[in-house]
A protein has these predicted regions:
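Conserved AMP-binding/adenylate-forming core of the ANL superfamily
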Residues: 28-74, 78-82, 99-104, 155-156
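Conserved AMP-binding/adenylation subdomain of ANL enzymes
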Residues: 200-219, 229-268, 282-290
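Conserved beta-loop-beta connector loops within the AMP-binding
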Residues: 363-391, 427-428, 490-494, 530
Length: 540
């Protein structure tokens, strides 16, 4: 017997067309640099997106060509999410928080042809362009300022386009649609390329009730950057469901977000723990200093990821009627792989158990296979105590890296992705992250390479050896601590060291906040730095 089902490929183009037709009056709200709000309907967004695709084709974009974005969260970035693939291109989101040299290297690795950039990021773009040459640079006049000489005006290009005459580029469901870079165990950026198929499947899984639970009646506030694993895939889910979107633009300070919530109350928001920590601090401070300034949107759910969520933070928000829902994933997993949500087996559990479970990474989502393996590659028991490396596979899990392939340290012989994260699983399937086997530091949802920092520190004439470890931080989840062995007779000034690191290409936020001068760095039996001993010494 054979199936009678049609063989119709999955495509973002279908989501775009359906949204413009079915949800024509739904709103997309963007906060501009001056903090005013600009609103488009889905019908207007649909037409502008088709116009962008038409423009890109007219400029010579060929199937598979890469178009970079250097943008905050706003309607034009959403147009790029769908317009670039509609033209047959691959959208490559550039992380504007990285040093310019690193952004340029990432753009070169991807082979970016065109760049779409916010006008307020033009100074950064100029530094990036010194590292990588884009054939065309298209500036979105986000602030309304004149577009710089030598660049194309995004709005002028769209005004002269023919969205009605545009035709989608034929494609296979496995054709690439977007690309993000992630840091691997060596600290070097690696490209992950998503397909029409993987993106649609990820959005469908994400929209399930126990996960994002997106509905047409929801209002989504994506605080997580659209250059971070595509804002966790939620823009695709929002378009799929016709959800109202409220984009915060560049205004991510706690006060700004709380102000925005008074104007456009969300029912669902997402961001890294640092965002929610600073928000609850500002909110509770205002309760006594400025009573009545803000109210928390009742029933708001906040998706939190990118770093572990403290149970105390979940409790703090719950006191004000907001529930924090934790998930786990990575750029390589699109990123949603697990979500913590209420289970029927726990409906009679007390509050303490409910909070304890909420602080876990959660349960594996459908279509993702997850296993924990010990150092010998054997499965570990699901007893909530035995630890192993998380390994995953599935239709929206990457099987390789762009230009690198499938290195043995990242993929098992039987094709599973080795995440480098260490965890336990219990009998209900709840995942609890216990450690990371890699030495990367995750600060405010951003990766910092300890290896790169160590190399730069040891290039200073006063430093003989340097080892960098992550230490817990209430606000940023983790911050780098540098342990230094100085050369005989050498002095040390923290400010001078920070200037040295920034001159080497590090951003200010990537530099260590704390330095410890020690006599020697402990080593293991193979001569490698024994960072466990440093963590035991300095993180008590």
């Amino acid at each position: 017997m054979q199936t009678t089902m049609m063989d119709v490929g999955l495509s973002l183009n279908g989501l775009l067309e359906r949204a413009g037709r079915t949800f024509a009056t739904q709103q997309i709200v963007s906060r501009l640099p001056d903090k005013s709000l600009r609103t488009h309907t889905y019908a207007q967004w649909h037409r502008r997106t088709r116009a962008l695709a038409s423009v890109l084709q007219r400029l010579g974009l060929q199937p598979g060509d890469v178009v970079a974005t250097l943008c905050w969260n706003h309607h034009v970035h959403l147009e790029a999410y769908f317009g670039i693939p509609a033209a047959g291109g691959v959208m490559h989101t550039l992380n504007l928080r990285l040093p310019p040299g690193e952004i340029g290297a990432i753009a070169a690795d991807a082979g970016d042809r065109f760049l779409i950039v916010d006008d307020i990021l033009w100074p950064l773009a100029q530094q990036v362009m010194a590292q990588h040459r884009f054939e065309r640079v298209i500036v979105f006049p986000f602030s309304g300022a004149p577009v710089p000489d030598g660049a194309d005006d995004y709005e002028s290009l769209l005004a002269g386009a023919d969205p009605d005459g545009f035709s989608f580029v034929p494609h296979d469901e496995h054709a690439p649609v977007s690309m993000c870079h992630t840091s691997g165990t060596t600290g070097s950026a690696k490209g992950v390329v998503y397909s029409h198929r993987s993106t649609v499947l990820h959005a469908l899984v994400g929209c399930m009730g126990d996960h994002w639970g997106l509905k047409n009646t929801d209002v989504l506030l994506p605080v997580a950057p659209m250059f971070h694993a595509n804002a966790w895939g939620t823009p695709y889910g929002a378009v799929m469901c016709g959800t109202k979107l409220v984009f915060p633009g560049p205004h991510l300070h706690a006060d700004d977000l709380l102000d925005l919530m008074q104007i456009e109350p969300p029912t669902l928001a997402l961001g890294v723990p640092t965002i929610w920590l600073t928000m609850i601090q500002a909110y509770e401070r205002a309760l006594t200093e400025q009573p009545g300034r803000w109210t928390m949107p009742q029933g708001l759910r906040s998706l939190v990821g990118g770093a572990a969520v403290p149970e105390s933070l979940i409790r703090a928000f719950d006191r004000h009627g907001v529930w924090l829902q934790q998930g786990w994933g990575m750029t390589e997993t699109s990123p949603l792989a697990t979500v913590s949500y209420p289970r029927v087996e726990l409906q009679d559990a007390g509050a303490d158990e409910r909070y304890r479970r909420a602080a876990m990474a959660g349960v594996t989502v459908p279509l993702v296979d997850l296993r924990l393996c010990d150092d010998d590659g054997a499965d570990v028991p699901h007893d909530g105590r035995s630890m192993g490396e998380i390994q995953v596979r599935g239709p929206f899990i990457t099987g390789a890296y762009h230009g690198v392939g499938s290195p043995a340290d990242k993929f098992t012989p039987d094709g599973w992705l080795r995440t480098g994260d260490v965890a336990t699983l219990d009998d209900l399937g709840f995942l609890r992250i216990t450690d990371r086997s890699k030495d990367l530091i995750k600060s405010g949802g951003e990766w910092i390479s300890s290896v790169d920092l160590e190399n730069a520190l040891m290039s200073h004439p006063a430093v003989a050896e340097a080892a960098v470890i992550a230490i817990p931080d209430e606000r940023w989840s983790e911050r780098p601590l540098a342990c230094l062995v100085l050369k005989p007779g050498a002095g040390f000034e923290p400010e001078a060291m920070r200037e040295h690191l920034m001159a080497a290409g590090f951003a200010k936020w990537q530099c260590p906040d704390r330095y410890e001068i020690i006599d020697a760095i402990p080593r293991n039996s193979t001569g490698k730095f024994w960072k466990l001993k440093l963590r035991e010494r300095f993180t008590r």
